[in-house]
């Protein structure tokens, strides 16, 4: 049996736990999500695909992997705001899929009970579906394993507390640099083949989904593969991994959508959203009814905030959900952006999808964005209050910005003639 070799990055964090934790506390099942990789080391590892099975099992709770590679085989890792010549931030600039070199490629399958979703029962079933789109995958090696959160049980009652339907399938891509294009194209073709559906979030957002997570395509993203930490009173089902020998995955064989296919894809997505429009409106109205009271803002304003979020703009009073389910508004991030740079959180529009689905990124241009890795990937732009935006643009303090804006507004008013005033009114 033959399995291709691949090089990836092993990450070790000094303090934070980089895997999921589960515990029973006073009869209640509790889960804690992985922490932030902010102070640690990176080391490149090379092995055959089948050797990943014992390797993953051997990792400690402070370790994870990254599919991309740094320039140097060994590196000290930090967050972007503390990056120096000797300390590397975990960003796309520093972790890359190298052109014409093999890289790990992951297909992530999660249980989804949304209306219209397709349940995938095994790795072989998913590969068979992909084979209808990409016949050459029939000869490609893969290793499949259950998600680290799968099969957690109560030792007292034998009750299954987490789903055991989720799994990861690993291949070795022949040309790592083509992985982002391949995943994006495969996602769209799966939707065209009838495997797309709309998940309506609690807040009424319509989120396109298919049988794989379309966002697992970024070289700097953490892959939490170490065994979950479980406390007394819990156990985990033994779910054996699956191995199939073969060769590398030639991603280039999967061609981009033609212009006609792109139009069909857009029409299909439009139809899927139309079919769930009423459900989404009901969910949104219910969400606004409850959240407007919790947040102390008007229903009209909250509706505006959510509509902006649907357009990938998160306004200053949008509520972000952190990994531990605590919340923070965008304005707090804007007030102290460097403290939030690199912080992992839940997807802005679908916090129920799980932890570590997105990351806050503070750019050198002072713009703040959230990169969501969930199901296809989205980039959200964060906007502060007008005074904070002006302060950022002018590189001044908030007090100085407030005075400058006041003077500027006075000047505008003085320069208005009567007709301008009538037009504005």
Protein language model regions, located:
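A short glycine-rich, hydrophobically flanked beta-strand micro-motif that places a catalytic Asp/Glu
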Residues: 144, 204-207
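Signature for HUH/AEP ssDNA processing cores
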Residues: 1-167, 171-193, 277-296
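Modules that initiate DNA replication and primer synthesis
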Residues: 107-117, 127-128, 148-195, 207-425
